Amino acid sequence: MELKELQVKTRQMAGGPTPKALRRQGFVPAIVYGHKNDPLPLAVDDHTFRLLLKDAGQQALLSLVIDDGAASKTVMLKELQQHPVSLKLIHADFHEVDLTKKITTYVPVATTGVCKGEKEGGVLQLIRRELEVRCLPGLIPESIAIDISALDIGDSVHVADIEAPEGVELVHEVNFTVIAVAAPTKETVEDEEAEEAAAEGAEETGETGETEEGGDE
């Protein structure tokens, strides 16, 4: 996983003594927790932070550049608090990581190919959108890719079937289902039949109209 750089300020440098004051100035209050260091309160520019999250996601490996390079820390986002209605960023918790030690985190599932069973009317179900992995921070994949092109109706993919990238371990105690291709429901079949009947009816009406017009000539 690529290391993403994020400029941050200590709260003294940001000029906001309280989280509320920081938010008024366009900052997101944040704090970094480390194994051997005291928690470090920080302030992150709201706009810059949103752009980074949109580009790299919440599982990104970050290099926090503090006070224009006075210090730096390698971290991952541990928790992000947002307002439930406005989605305004309220607070961020970062966890400092050691690049030489393995960590456990979650990465999204990505599908590749066109599902054979879906072409035949089946319903592709993504049951697990994230998988837990353990690896060195620098080896965290952006996603776990699963090829679905050979899956037929009734087939499924379990976590034990998935080949993880080199250096990455899939953490699981139970061989749970990640993807399944279900048979179409009765309602789905009836809807498709109704749509086909409506389409055929429209074609017949069009043909009848053309015949009548031809007869008038």
UniProtKB/Swiss-Prot annotation:
Stretch list, region Disordered: 185-217
Coiled-coil ranges (or none)? none
Question: What are the record keywords, sorted?
Answer: Ribonucleoprotein, Ribosomal protein, RNA-binding, rRNA-binding
Q: Which cysteines are joined by disulfide bonds?
A: none
CC per GO annotation: cytosolic large ribosomal subunit
GO term, biological process aspect, one: translation
Which CDD domains does the UniProt record give?
Ribosomal_L25_TL5_CTC
* Oligomeric and partner information: Part of the 50S ribosomal subunit; part of the 5S rRNA/L5/L18/L25 subcomplex. Contacts the 5S rRNA. Binds to the 5S rRNA independently of L5 and L18.
Its annotated function is as follows:
This is one of the proteins that binds to the 5S RNA in the ribosome where it forms part of the central protuberance.
**Protein name from the UniProt record:** Large ribosomal subunit protein bL25
Organism lineage: Bacteria, Pseudomonadati, Thermodesulfobacteriota, Desulfobacteria, Desulfobacterales
